[in-house]
Amino acid sequence: AEQQNFLSDLTGSFSSPCNENPTVAMMXISYXXQXIWAS
């Protein structure tokens, strides 16, 4: 199975391993709701 990568240039993540943590993806959704395009 291919691993998902949820890292972003705008939102930091201090988890380990951070590639598999969806928190950054959830933050990107909240940015979009505020019309902030953070990809």
Swiss-Prot record:
GO MF, one example: fructose 5-dehydrogenase (NADP+) activity
Entry EC no(s): 1.1.1.124
Catalytic activities: D-fructose + NADP(+) = 5-dehydro-D-fructose + NADPH + H(+)
UniProt keyword terms in alphabetical order: NADP, Oxidoreductase
Top-level class of the enzyme under EC nomenclature: oxidoreductase
Name the record gives this protein: Fructose 5-dehydrogenase [NADP(+)]
Originating organism: Erwinia citreus
